């Protein structure tokens, strides 16, 4: 029996998050940069300030193309989550770049995942 030699990467997307770290967005930036081999279509990050305000930056392109010093400075806070995208479903465009930021009557939240949300339409219309 011949051994199977597979020399291709089979990694899709990357998620990085930190809690309780000063300048969390900067650490998340470097985390996303180190995960960039997992997705190069786009990236994004959401930070949470001490007051609970959420801010997001996202865009198409490499991590170094999407973020700059001014954008990172706007992401003040000690919590952040980021995502690099490699699409397996859905189209391109900024609207599909994570993290997603939701404003709900129960509170705001950000979500980044590595997979497909198959019931997104149902969840979108949930009361």
Task: Outline where the language-model segments fall.
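N-terminal glutamine amidotransferase
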Residues: 1-121, 126
């Amino acid at each position: 029996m011949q051994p199977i030699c597979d020399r291709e990467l089979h990694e899709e997307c990357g998620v990085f998050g930190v809690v309780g770290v000063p300048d969390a967005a900067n650490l998340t930036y470097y985390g996303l940069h180190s995960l960039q081999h997992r997705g190069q279509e786009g990236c994004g990050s959401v930070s949470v300030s001490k007051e609970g305000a959420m801010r997001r930056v996202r865009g198409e392109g490499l991590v170094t193309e999407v973020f700059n010093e001014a954008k990172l400075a706007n992401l003040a806070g000690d919590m952040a989550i980021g995502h690099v995208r490699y699409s397996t479903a859905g189209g391109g465009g900024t609207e599909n770049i994570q993290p997603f930021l939701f404003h709900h009557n129960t509170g705001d939240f950000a979500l980044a995942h590595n997979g497909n949300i198959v019931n997104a339409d149902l969840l979108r219309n949930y009361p």
